[in-house]
């Protein structure tokens, strides 16, 4: 892991070392509030596994914002096994998370943010309609900044990979200079040009979300709701509880 000496194990705990349960989490949140002089909101980000239970615990512990990260989320520093075979889909997690906040009386007090595989305004609009208050973007912004750019194909080849499938964030050998501490590689990244591309990407996403909201007759993107959606497959309906197109009721096994 970057500066860790060869032969020295990287400590990666299965649990967060600062808390083991809901009570410890509440204490940690209060510690963070004191450390920041109560000036910033406290976010809790979690993988989407048991959203109905986990979101309730986080909300009751005092979080201002709960971020649910679905299985489609990408990261350059996780094993392929975990990337491909853990977590539940983002869209199915949102509905359960929203219902959890409703059931524990935290809607309006705790914000719900959806993350994981959100690339376009269409993805974001679906998340908002399913109950998310906002969305979080990771890989999409990185790609806009220049991640996986084909400009340095020889460097990708040396890493045994290719543009579009790099997965070397954790090595510090990022060919485009984004995920690295190497001064020479960092020179390849033009932060001003990257920022301009990311700004255009976010602007385009916002325009897409706005257009979809208008198409649904809504004056605000935050007025999008489940009734604006229809599932095009039995699987999508079963995952999300969204009504099936043509029969106007959710699919039930």
Where do the PLM segments sit?
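Glycine-rich phosphate/ribose-binding loops and adjacent secondary-structure elements
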Residues: 11-186
């Amino acid at each position: 892991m970057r500066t860790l000496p060869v032969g020295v194990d990287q400590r990666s705990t299965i649990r967060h070392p600062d808390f083991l349960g809901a009570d410890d989490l509440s204490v940690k949140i209060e510690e963070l509030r004191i450390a920041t002089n109560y000036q910033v909101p406290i976010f809790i980000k979690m993988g989407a596994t048991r959203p109905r239970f986990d979101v309730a615990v986080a909300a009751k512990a005092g979080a201002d914002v709960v971020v649910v990260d679905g299985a489609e989320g990408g990261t350059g520093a996780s094993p392929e096994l975990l990337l491909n075979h853990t977590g539940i889909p983002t869209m199915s997690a949102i509905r359960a998370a929203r219902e959890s906040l409703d059931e524990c009386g935290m809607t309006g007090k705790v914000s719900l943010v959806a993350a994981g595989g959100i690339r376009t305004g269409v993805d974001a609009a679906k998340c908002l309609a399913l109950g998310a208050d906002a969305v979080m973007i990771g890989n999409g912004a990185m790609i806009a900044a220049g991640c996986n750019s084909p400009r340095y194909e020889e460097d990708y080849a040396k890493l045994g990979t290719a543009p579009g499938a790099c997965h070397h964030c954790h090595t510090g050998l990022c060919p485009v200079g984004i995920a690295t501490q190497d001064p020479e590689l960092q020179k390849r990244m033009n932060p001003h040009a990257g920022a301009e591309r990311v700004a255009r990407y976010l602007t385009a996403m916002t325009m897409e979300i706005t257009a979809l909201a208008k198409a649904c007759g809504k004056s605000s993107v935050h007025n999008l709701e489940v009734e604006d959606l229809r599932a095009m497959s039995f699987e999508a309906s079963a995952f999300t509880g969204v009504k099936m197109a043509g029969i106007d009721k959710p699919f039930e096994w």
